[in-house]
A protein has these predicted regions:
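Extracellular/periplasmic metallocenter environments
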Residues: 199-200
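Short, hydrophobic/aromatic alpha-helical segments in well-folded domains
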Residues: 188-189
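Short, solvent-exposed loop/turn segments at the edges of extracellular beta-sandwich modules
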Residues: 208-213
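Secretory targeting and sorting signals
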Residues: 1-26
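Surface-exposed loops/turns
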Residues: 195-196
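Hydrophobic/tyrosine-rich beta-strand signature of extracellular beta-sandwich/beta-rich modules
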Residues: 203-205, 323
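Phosphate/adenylate-binding glycine loop and adjacent helical scaffold
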Residues: 26-177, 182-185, 216-219, 225-385
Length: 386
């Protein structure tokens, strides 16, 4: 998990002073949405003598900055088994993530009979001029990750010998930060996230010219929404805007409550690992409930007739969840107290208590430098691994 630098948004009395850049609700509504299909992102192209990173899916090639990949729940078309959860193998090859048998939200390496929830990899266009690059290769560099948890791109099998793990990119302390590319590179890999929520991944493509000079594009950032509801096709008002437009009042009298509990009556594969998040309003207010996990956006839920509900895989680790309710009409708005969530346990808070602020966390973890380093002294160790 990240070591967050947490910024507290303005109190109710000074909310109007917040700049739009701090808004956290529906932040990717209106972008190109990559989901339930085969996706190459980032895919490296060569245009105007520079690398350009795009997302290729469904006949589209938008810039990665204009794209959000949504990793929701997905199930095999063959046997209805879930395709969004990955359990660490018993052979211990991924104990750098957690103990064998621990389960995480994951965009799958392989899908069966469909591309649900998403078939996500990265690649390079066939016109990449690798003949101009030293050794005929370029590299996709993962420069930073900003989100509620860690990320890892890999392939693996639960073989007894433990020889099938291929780590590609990631944010763990010993994760690779660069993956080689040749013209036409195309990967099928798992992309694991230790918690649900909104992740911002910053990439670049780099190579060495035959003269040894660095060739690299400016860093570009893309978004992956893990869990939550699908981002909307159209752009929507931000949380800050909705909150400023909603009414102040006596939230305690309105009778708002937020509850998290293990999902009852599991129906689909993986449901036994889900948590049901429920919001209720005794005043039957309608509006939008924004959920944040460790200060990062998780999802927006429509509140109808005083109720909203969502089943989510919260991951194996504790987290802190906060809700912000922006009702329609003259019903009072509410910011919940941060709710400490423990996997497999029930948690509850209500509007008899309210927070003056909601938390917004942003702590990009810098993984790789963008500046060249000149080695001026001895004593360095180089590690190479297959």
């Amino acid at each position: 998990m990240a070591s967050p630098r947490t910024r507290f948004l303005a109190t109710l009395s000074t909310l109007a002073l917040i700049t739009p850049a701090t808004a956290v609700a529906g932040p990717d509504d209106g972008k190109h949405i990559a989901t339930n299909t085969h996706v190459d992102s980032p895919k490296s192209f060569w245009e105007n003598n520079d690398f350009v990173l795009k997302s290729e899916f469904g006949g589209q090639e938008p810039p990665i900055a204009d794209t959000v990949a949504w990793v929701g729940k997905g199930y095999s078309a063959t046997d209805n088994s879930n395709q969004y959860l990955y359990t660490l193998p018993a052979n211990g090859t991924q104990d750098y993530i957690g103990a064998p048998g621990t389960t995480y939200y994951t965009a799958p390496h392989q899908v069966s009979g469909n591309t649900s929830p998403i078939w996500l990899g990265f690649g390079a266009d066939t016109s990449l001029p690798t003949d101009k690059f030293r050794d005929g290769v370029a590299f996709l560099d993962l420069l930073s990750v900003d989100g509620p948890g860690e990320v890892e791109l890999f392939t693996n099998k639960d073989d007894e010998a433990g020889t099938q793990l291929h780590r590609m990119l990631g944010s763990f302390p010993d994760s690779p930060h660069s993956a080689y590319l040749v013209a036409g590179t195309h990967t099928h890999n798992s992309t694991l996230f230790t918690k649900p929520g909104r992740y911002r991944l910053t990439y670049r493509t780099s190579a060495r010219g035959r003269d040894g000079q660095l060739i690299a594009n400016e860093p570009q950032t893309t978004t992956i929404q893990v869990g939550g509801q699908k981002p909307k096709e159209e752009k929507t008002p931000s949380l800050k805007e909705r909150f400023a437009q909603s009414a102040a009042g006596n939230a305690a009298a309105a009778g708002y409550s937020l509850r998290m509990a293990p999902k009852s009556n599991p129906e689909k594969d993986g449901d036994d690992k889900l948590t049901t998040i429920s919001f209720d309003a005794k005043n039957k207010a309608q509006g939008t409930l924004t959920l944040l996990i460790d200060g990062y956006f998780l999802t927006d839920l429509p509140v109808k007739d005083g109720h909203a509900q969502w089943d989510e895989y919260m991951g194996p680790d504790p987290s802190q969840v906060q809700a912000v309710f922006t009702p329609e009409g003259d019903a009072p708005r509410w910011i919940s107290q941060p709710l400490d969530f423990q996997p497999g346990k029930s948690s509850h808070t209500d509007s008899s208590a309210a927070a003056d602020t909601w938390q917004e966390t942003s702590q990009p973890r810098q993984l790789a430098p963008t500046q060249e380093t000149e080695l001026k002294e001895l004593g360095y160790t180089i590690r190479m691994r297959k």
